[in-house]
């Protein structure tokens, strides 16, 4: 295990009351969290989203990406389902950090796409480590997942890490004129499945 479970509290939201569970990475002290809705015990697959932190989309309502839209719709679907988990994966900007994300945005303003911008800054297209999420699922006792994602790589990595993903549930939301190039790049260069 790369993580330990350290704290929990109720989190009232517009979608209902979630249980917020905090985790800490053993090696770095970095924190991550899970939002649990309803009773997730048992063998029935749990509707879940692994949502990577995006301050600009999640909290500042940026139209450059689809992240904030995905977060809101994932919480809505989990609440409608009556049970589920949203893992909030604290790896901002596909794990390049907030300041480098701002630098990447500046390069995109000059014509680079999201992948080219990361490469120009010396990063891979995606620096995230999803194995941490596998440990969170295990610590929560989740045996099978219906994963809300458009990213087949996320499904592959979590499956390799021992998570039983029984279904990939598409989450195609938030398309707008400000992010159409970004979404096209995610589909063409990163393999995201964005066709309805």
Swiss-Prot record:
GO terms for biological process: riboflavin biosynthetic process. Binds 1 zinc ion per subunit. GTP binds at residues 49-53, 70, 92-94, 114, 149, 154. Signal peptide: none annotated. It catalyses: GTP + 4 H2O = 2,5-diamino-6-hydroxy-4-(5-phosphoribosylamino)-pyrimidine + formate + 2 phosphate + 3 H(+). Catalyzes the conversion of GTP to 2,5-diamino-6-ribosylamino-4(3H)-pyrimidinone 5'-phosphate (DARP), formate and pyrophosphate. Belongs to the GTP cyclohydrolase II family. Homodimer. This is GTP cyclohydrolase-2. It comes from Yersinia pestis. The gene is ribA.
């Amino acid at each position: 295990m790369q993580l330990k479970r350290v704290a929990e509290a109720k989190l009232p939201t517009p979608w209902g009351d979630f249980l917020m569970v905090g985790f800490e990475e053993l090696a770095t002290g970095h924190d991550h969290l899970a939002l649990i809705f309803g009773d997730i015990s048992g063998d029935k697959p749990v509707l879940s989203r692994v949502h990577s932190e995006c301050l600009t989309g999640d909290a500042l309502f940026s139209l450059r990406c689809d992240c904030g839209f995905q977060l809101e719709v994932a919480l809505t679907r989990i609440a409608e389902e009556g049970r589920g988990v949203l893992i909030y994966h604290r790896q901002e900007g596909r794990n390049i950090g907030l300041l480098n994300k701002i630098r990447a945005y500046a390069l995109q303003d000059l014509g680079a796409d999201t992948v080219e911008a990361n490469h120009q800054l010396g990063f891979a297209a995606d620096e995230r480590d999803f194995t941490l999420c596998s440990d969170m699922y295990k610590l929560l006792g989740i045996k099978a997942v219906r994963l809300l994602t458009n990213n087949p790589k996320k499904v592959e990595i979590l499956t390799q890490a021992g998570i039983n993903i029984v279904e990939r549930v598409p989450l195609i939301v938030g398309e707008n004129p400000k992010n159409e190039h970004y979404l096209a790049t995610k589909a063409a260069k990163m393999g995201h499945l964005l066709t309805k």
